[in-house]
């Protein structure tokens, strides 16, 4: 949200859009500015439904369509709109599909940067963001189980969980990787922050720090 904004309503974007936005900002934009992102490409591999739901499960993977001519699925469009509130005009495109799982969404990402970057640079940027968790686990079931056992009411509040060994840098400018989406958890944190912003516009950032102990560095 912009400072000194007169907005009475806000949109809290989806959990996958949170993930896309966090990864893009952390790796490509923060400390460099929006011009550092040449392009961002994303594949949202979505779970079929939540473990609490008895309906809408699918028997096999199902691919989505590209509804938007410029952005593909709504995820990149929503992330673009989010960054546009800061005056950024980003080159983003996403695709989406569902798989027959109830655990977690998976995000594949490709970020091309203007400035050269190394794998160690990427890791340092991810580790410097308190809202990013990293993991050596490569299955959604084991990360989901960790959240169930150790998360706040079973939820992971981090914006994303990056699989470290999946990260790859090509030609000094192209970053590839996979990360898991803490569905509900990351958008819940944004909802709390937005509410605090309305109530305490000048001190909301300090007030939400009471939740910082609920963020994981490593899963």
What are these regions (language model features)?
Residues 129-139, 201-207, 216-219:
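Short, cationic low-complexity segments
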Residues 1-54, 194-198, 202-216:
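N-terminal Rossmann-like NAD(P) cofactor-binding subdomain of oxidoreductases
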Residues 35-185:
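C-terminal substrate-binding/catalytic lobe of Rossmann-fold NAD(P)-dependent oxidoreductases
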Residues 21-28, 76-80, 120-123, 188-196:
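Predominant activation on well-ordered alpha-helical scaffold segments within soluble catalytic domains
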Residues 175-207:
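Long, low-complexity C-terminal extensions of enzymes
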């Amino acid at each position: 949200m912009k400072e000194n904004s007169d907005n009475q309503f806000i949109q809290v974007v989806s959990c996958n859009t949170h993930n896309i936005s966090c990864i893009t900002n952390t790796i490509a934009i923060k400390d460099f500015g929006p011009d550092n992102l040449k392009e961002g490409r994303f594949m949202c591999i979505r779970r079929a439904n939540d473990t609490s739901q008895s309906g809408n499960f699918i028997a096999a993977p199902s691919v989505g369509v590209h509804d938007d001519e410029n952005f593909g699925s709504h995820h990149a469009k929503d992330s673009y709109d989010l960054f546009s509130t800061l005056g950024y005009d980003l080159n983003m495109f996403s695709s989406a599909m569902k798989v027959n799982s109830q655990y977690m969404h998976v995000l594949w990402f490709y970020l091309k940067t203007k400035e050269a970057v190394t794998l160690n640079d990427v890791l340092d940027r991810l580790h410097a963001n308190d809202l990013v968790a990293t993991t050596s686990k490569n299955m959604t079931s084991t990360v989901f189980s960790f959240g169930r056992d150790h998360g706040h009411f079973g939820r992971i509040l981090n914006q994303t969980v990056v699989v470290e060994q999946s990260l790859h840098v090509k030609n000094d400018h192209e970053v590839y990787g996979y990360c898991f989406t803490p569905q509900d958890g990351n958008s819940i944190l944004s909802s709390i922050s937005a509410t605090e912003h309305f109530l305490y516009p000048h001190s909301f950032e300090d007030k939400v720090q009471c939740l910082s102990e609920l963020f994981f560095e490593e899963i």
